[in-house]
Amino acid sequence: MMRKLAVTLALASTALATPALARDNAWYVGVEGGAMIVEDINFDIGAATSAGTVDHNYGWDVGGVIGYDLGGFRIEADVSYRRATVDGYRSTVTTPARTAAGALVNFPAGNYDYAGGSSSALSFMVNGLLDFGEDDGIQGFIGGGVGVSRVKADYGLNDNGSFLDDSDTVFAWQVLAGLRQPISDNIDVTLKYRFFNADNVKLVDVTGRNFDGRFRSHSILGGITFNFGEPPAPPPPPPPVE
């Protein structure tokens, strides 16, 4: 009787120790999207420090990932695009801009609450993520990544034409944290926070003046991930020979 009880407990403990949804040594692909806040962009204009500031409305952030789960640590590549429209522009120097008719006019320093246009960033990143928690339950993760980003600015004053329409490709980095939850043997849903930073963005306005600044954003993203290619689970151990 005691031997049978010991065998039963051994088999039960083996089953409990083996995750129902093993993600170790598996590939995954995913898509994600959500809302974004862009920090005010302060531009050095020519020799004038912090001479122009761009305010933004709420924006959006979408992307896709492909990665590999090493067991407790994941490495992945992601491509993402984020964009927000301009809510206002203020400058301590004059702003040359083209009118709707195409004429070039110098607008005085001041606040332009109805400035238009958008800021955007397309990025290609490589990330490393640390996982904590069980594969078959809610699992947390934290990590970061580095890569390159193409930052684009397209700004206009009021109903007039553009005063800045340029882009630059720069080094970028990001910090990531979130949760993931399996909903089937191969599919997870995710909730992620992303802090994204692209420094040393150098742009040129319609008259050739340099605009130097940075792009920073905060995003909350929902996503779905498909896991595939995991090795088959090992067979259960044979029962002890009585």
Question: Language model features by range: what are they?
Answer:
Residues 5-30, 229-242:
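Outer-membrane beta-barrel biogenesis signature
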Residues 20-67, 153, 223-227:
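Short glycine/proline- and aromatic-enriched beta-strand/turn motifs that initiate or cap beta-hairpins
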Residues 23-29, 71-73, 136-140, 169, ...:
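Outer-envelope beta-barrel architecture signal
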Residues 37, 56-62, 118-124, 167-173, ...:
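Residues that define the transmembrane beta-barrel architecture of outer-membrane proteins
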Residues 41-49, 87-94, 152-161, 201-209:
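Outer-membrane beta-barrel translocator domains and adjoining extracellular loop/strand segments
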Residues 65-157, 221-228:
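Gram-negative (and chloroplast) outer-membrane scaffold detector with strong preference
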Residues 98, 103, 184-241:
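Predominantly the C-terminal beta-signal and adjacent terminal strand-loop region
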